[in-house]
Amino acid sequence: MTVRMLHVLGSPVLRQQAARVAAVDDEVRRLVDDLFETMRAAKGVGLAANQIGVAQRVAVVDVGEEDPPPLALINPQIVERREEVQTAEEGCLSIPDIFGDVERHARVVVAALDVQGQPFRVEAHGYKARAIQHEIDHLDGILFLDHLSAV
């Protein structure tokens, strides 16, 4: 596992739509390991591959809850959203020292592949749902700043 360099606001890869992973292999598993290592070293709760310069649809989330445990999401897709939304402050490892209130769905169901290439679904509420939506936005080239209303 390697701690990778974080790309910050202004890096073109952060605005790229990440490519789907064709096959989950050892290279993708190493990427997942590096994402977890980099996220933890930076004291984050989520990280998308394009934040370390890799434009593939891979993200990790660990908000410190045991159920579900830390998540590796390969080719994640939100398949269900609760209409109810919640507004809370967000920040981003790629946008240091800037925070803002972002409205997100309170509950989401995500379909993805695990590190063995097996499909799974996860239902997330609250903070975990927020973190997952934030990371999937990254994979679509969207930053939390894009959700902020002009003041």
Q: Each PLM stretch: what is its role?
A:
Residues 1-151:
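Positively charged
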